[in-house]
Regions:
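Internal/C-terminal transmembrane anchor helices
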Residues: 1-5
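Aromatic- and Gly/Pro-enriched helix-to-coil junctions and flexible linker segments
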Residues: 9-169
Length: 169
């Protein structure tokens, strides 16, 4: 029992069952595992959208918080609230506002996928180029948790990314 409890603390409450095949899950009366999809919600009034709340947070929720949340903190890092994002993890702060390439959050996304420090790790759904560009843009312009899209400079690189949110693509 203690080994199982320790595993739950380290790997999350579903670590023993997360990779069970659908047939075994069905036989045990468990729910099917939902396949992760890239869901981009259409934002009707994009200029008035809060960048963190409506653009950044959904990416972190879909791709990062399964390992970095209140119940499971890989690297002692939580990405589920602004306060914990600013706090960083066991290696220190993950955001260097205004300096995306000095920010661990961005650096780890850009590492070679074979690098042991690449995020997300093998077996997890990687971020799309648009999602990485969005996070880069957010950090580049201060990683502010309250600013609206209209309050940040929009260059040619981020325009198509933002357009995808305006169109729900």
């Amino acid at each position: 029992i203690t080994g199982h409890y320790g595993g739950n603390l380290t790997h999350g409450s579903d670590y023993l069952t997360a990779s069970l095949p659908a047939s075994a899950r069905s036989m045990l009366g468990m729910k099917e595992v939902e396949v992760e999809k890239n869901v981009v919600e259409k934002i009707a009034n994009l200029p008035e959208a809060i960048v963190y709340t409506q653009l950044v947070k959904p990416v972190l929720t879909q791709k990062c918080t399964s390992c970095h949340n209140d119940q499971k903190q890989k690297g002692k890092l939580r990405l589920d609230t602004p306060e914990f994002i600013l706090q960083g993890g066991e290696d220190g702060p993950i955001i260097s506002a205004g300096k995306p390439l000095d920010s661990e959050l961005i650096k780890r996304l850009l590492l070679d996928t074979n690098d042991e420090h690449h995020m997300p790790p093998k077996g997890k759904t990687p971020l799309t180029d648009n999602e990485i560009a969005l996070l880069h843009w957010w950090v580049q312009h201060g990683a502010d948790f309250t600013k609206k899209v209209a309050q940040l400079p929009v260059d040619d690189k981020i325009k198509p990314v933002l357009a995808s949110y305006a169109n729900g693509e």
